[in-house]
Structures are given as structure tokens and as C-alpha cells.
From Swiss-Prot:
It comes from the Bacteria. One of its GO terms (biological process) is tRNA threonylcarbamoyladenosine modification. Pfam families: TsaD. InterPro entries: ATPase_NBD, Gcp-like_dom, T6A_TsaB. This is Uncharacterized protein RP551. Gene3D superfamilies: 3.30.420.40.
Length: 186
């Protein structure tokens, strides 16, 4: 919290100046996601004038992709899940979103090989399968966006608001794989 306070002072803002508080909910580091969400909950409890906006790391990568590529049929977002696995979510040009999945590298490669149309691939997990898909002519690969940038999230939220699209305000982590502690107990 001291870091947040320092940034607010530096920007000459108070919490009363804020309309929205945006936070990412994952998937990602279990501890990092939990700390971010807990901090957001604390601020939102203290300041009722602020509205919560939750953006997944999939949505973040998807938004970065559509700002770079306009002609596509589907966008595949791959996030590194480690242990030779990826988190994957597919966004269709029509607006349909498939449910996020935990997959292995082979599944991703086979699925992309069978795809037709113009397919965009992006996300931190793309590097794990890149050498296996780089020669597929229907695949457009975008560089991974190593860090989530606050300004991109703000731009995404502004875009959503301008289109009257309902924003996610559920301050809850996006779990696709159970936390290690849970798997150990089971």
C-alpha cells in the first residue's frame, strides 16, 4: 500500500479523484494476483465512490492484439502456465469468447495446425510453441507483451465504456489450474 500512496502523491491525486479502480485477476502468479486483488478490495471498501473493473490477462493480450491487427478470424492468447503447459483463450472476430483452458504444448500446436482462416497468436506463452507454428502460413504471431501496462488497461476500459459494454466488477481471481497447496492436499 505505501507504493500506491507514493504514486498517488506523485500524481497529485487522491482516492476521491478516482472513478474506477482497475485490477487484473490472472491467470498468473497465485501470490501476486491475491495481493493485487486484496489491495483493490481494501481501497474499494474504504472509498465507495470508486467502481471496480477487473481485466483478465487474456483480455489484456487480446486488446493489445486488436490494436495491431484488424483482419483476423480468431485471436489465440497463450499465457505461460509453466510445467510445459499453457493457459489458452480464443477470441472470435464475432465477439464470441471460448472458455479459458489449461493445455499442453502439443494440444496448442495440433489445434493451430488444424485451424483455417486468419489466426492471430499472442501472449507470454507463445514463445513456448513458436518454433512449431512459425511456418504455418495462416498464423500471424505478435511479440509477447512481457509486462502488463496500466495505460493499456485504461485504454481497454475506455474502449469498453465507449461501446456501452458491461465491465467485470467481480474482484475474484481467475483460477484455471488449482493452486499448488490445493493439489497437494487432494
Amino acid at each position: 500500500m505505501p507504493m500506491i500512496e507514493d504514486i498517488m502523491k506523485l500524481a497529485k491525486f487522491s482516492y476521491d479523484d478516482l472513478d474506477y479502480l482497475a485490477v487484473t485477476n490472472g491467470p498468473g502468479s497465485f501470490t501476486g494476483i491475491r495481493i493485487g486483488l486484496a489491495s483493490a478490495k481494501g481501497i474499494l471498501c474504504a472509498k465507495k465512490n470508486i467502481k471496480a473493473v477487473v481485466v483478465s490477462n487474456f483480455e489484456y493480450a487480446y486488446f493489445r492484439a486488436i490494436t495491431q491487427v484488424k483482419n483476423y478470424d480468431k485471436i489465440y492468447v497463450f499465457l505461460n502456465a509453466y510445467r510445459l503447459q499453457l493457459y489458452m483463450q480464443v477470441f472470435h472476430k464475432s465477439g464470441k469468447r471460448e472458455e479459458p483452458l489449461l493445455i499442453d504444448y502439443d494440444y496448442a500446436i495440433k489445434r493451430l495446425t488444424k485451424e483455417q482462416g486468419s489466426i492471430v497468436c499472442c501472449g507470454s506463452g507463445l514463445e513456448c510453441i513458436y518454433h512449431n507454428i512459425m511456418y504455418l502460413s495462416h498464423i500471424i504471431t505478435l511479440p509477447r507483451f512481457a509486462r502488463v501496462k496500466a495505460w493499456v488497461i485504461c485504454r481497454y476500459i475506455t474502449t469498453m465504456l465507449s461501446r456501452d459494454i458491461k465491465l467485470n466488477n467481480s474482484i475474484a481471481p481467475l483460477y484455471i489450474r488449482q493452486p499448488d497447496a490445493k493439489r497437494t492436499i487432494d
